[in-house]
């Protein structure tokens, strides 16, 4: 059975969670198809998510379709929670990019696309809400072309599809047709981004998308040596620390030791429910308990640390209430700082400083501190997070002394410095 990890990514209100719900319902994984506006979807079970109608935290679910086991990570679509989305990208085999057919490509869509390029994630595209849009498929495809010229409506002719990849061109010229494996290879190499249209709410186009995921995806070669990537730290309802990983090679077992810490449990999550398993093998997405040292972006065995490319633009000072215990205030923030590393938490004598993306994230931070730790906090108006760097090329001379001889090294640092161009009467 082919086993893959797929990520649901989109700008806010594109219908990403609705598509996740439709995929689970269509395959018989869930019996009731919830709706975001009814506040009863399978994956948005957090109270704040249901009240706001947006995804705040990434969720894991899985389904079986034909000879495939697909694990889906439903990620936040709101720009304020882009860090949570980016961390999931490091463990994806493929992304499903959902576009709102009413809007086309949005600014955050471009951010997502750039991140997919950074992490080398191949993608399928699903244009949603086609039952409501006044745009034609051709107009929407024209909008999508600003992301890549390799996006192709899969209802096009095989000749048009083949034109996007040299190997497919050769095959088509020789045989007059294309094999599914050839199309799958082009997608995996990011020479082709298949495009589908439909309505997730009405389950239109969902069967076609599932069929494409079956026919046009490839599984990575088996790896025997242990390797795993950490992409999420969170806590369960009892406060148990959960380390979400994707096993990319070998096997992990309960009671195995990682950095002198023993794995207590291996949990296989389906929404907010989980099953305890004794081991996890390649391509499994699981949560570990008993592990305190690993952080988001870390790895187990073979691999490398993943660093976020995103940087929040604002710094905020956070004050506890007058009645608060300062140590409890700090320890509570440390928990949230583990779960969202982009907070870049700094602690001072009587307050803390965090980096945040926007107003919605501020509101959620306040609510999390109240709901989870019974802490009332005050957040100031914030200031721009400036980054300091050199303006001009400089030459530095450094010396190092190997065992047998004296050496001198000249280092030349060069940074292109530019100032903003005048715009709307402003001066740089």
Located regions from the model:
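C-terminal polymerase-core module
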Residues: 383-419
